[in-house]
Amino acid sequence: MSNRKYFGTDGIRGRVGDAPITPDFVLKLGWAAGKVLARHGSRKIIIGKDTRISGYMLESALEAGLAAAGLSALFTGPMPTPAVAYLTRTFRAEAGIVISASHNPFYDNGIKFFSIDGTKLPDAVEEAIEAEMEKEISCVDSAELGKASRIVDAAGRYIEFCKATFPNELSLSELKIVVDCANGATYHIAPNVLRELGANVIAIGCEPNGVNINAEVGATDVRALQARVLAEKADLGIAFDGDGDRVIMVDHEGNKVDGDQIMYIIAREGLRQGQLRGGAVGTLMSNMGLELALKQLGIPFARAKVGDRYVLEKMQEKGWRIGAENSGHVILLDKTTTGDGIVAGLQVLAAMARNHMSLHDLCSGMKMFPQILVNVRYTAGSGDPLEHESVKAVTAEVEAALGSRGRVLLRKSGTEPLIRVMVEGEDEAQVTEFAHRIADAVKAV
């Protein structure tokens, strides 16, 4: 990937009011994107957002820029990121734009693009947009200006799409489900999907006010969900993040079920139904218990770099159809084009309904290994601690002691002088001691 000025691996993101998430920048971005995308023929762009208060300001700025370039905007209102990808495909729009900062706090926001087929924009198009940003903004003739309109049935369309990924012969009528929508974009979607499939639904995190997205609710903080599942004696809980591309679950005992366990359940069910093609893709952070459990089932497993973008790239490279991060991004290419929390959750619910098993029992075939993470700061000018012989020696000792039943992963932070030490194995006390031994070696450099 070339050096970008604005686009990161997941679009453009930052604190609202600070560059680049300012009204003037976003207007210019809309104009530049419009100039580039207009070359491709269609003049429609879908714009969706999550529930952040800044979404109103940013969608107006985007629309003004697009209109100046001669493109029309179709607004969805608050809508999950995967819904925008789906609507972009079905409306055959030239692109879809999501205004969201996913699981971040309300004061952050971001802009992410989807291409006409519901996948990430090609690098070449992002680079062309960046090149256009360097030019002086101009306006097409008045007769050529773009317009804005609203897709009034956007939510209904996406609800039907989600329901269609759940087998017709199954029902959720025997399940009591607590759903936590993080006060985010799934608040008017997920409870309706589950109710229409027959579930008894208790909804929390469904009262967005513009500033409470992801605040002590949702996939990044499941404590409220765990408490409610136990209080209601529910069969399970499902949590989404602010833009609905992540899902984390909670079993009837209040235990957290993460993206690794969700992928295990879906992959095993695919194997049982004769629908699994190839293997499954995780990341460097995926639990070793997942790798061993899939191996026992004869399902190939590969690790990608951390980030759903890299998971998708590895899936495409291998020709596989399922991938996930332990954070809850689950990509099911047989169902959709991007990570979709609602669709992934429905596949787990289908496995529960088909096998008449609890979520707790479906997870029992996979033993999660203790994973200990230690962050170690180092002096930026002191060179790379990971290249130091003493660190290499201690790491080699730990790897030898763990053998094939554990892992060591050392990663440098991309944003600060920090080494992330991760040690994984069967014995938590031993793994903790090993992690701190490596951390001490890094500190001593």
UniProtKB/Swiss-Prot annotation:
GO terms assigned for molecular function: magnesium ion binding; phosphoglucosamine mutase activity; phosphomannomutase activity
Domain of life according to the entry: Bacteria
EC number: 5.4.2.10
Modification sites for Phosphoserine: 102
Class of enzymatic activity (EC top level): isomerase
PANTHER family: PHOSPHOGLUCOMUTASE (ALPHA-D-GLUCOSE-1,6-BISPHOSPHATE-DEPENDENT) (PTHR42946:SF1), PHOSPHOHEXOSE MUTASE (PTHR42946)
Function text: Catalyzes the conversion of glucosamine-6-phosphate to glucosamine-1-phosphate.
Family: Belongs to the phosphohexose mutase family.
Name of this chain's protein: Phosphoglucosamine mutase
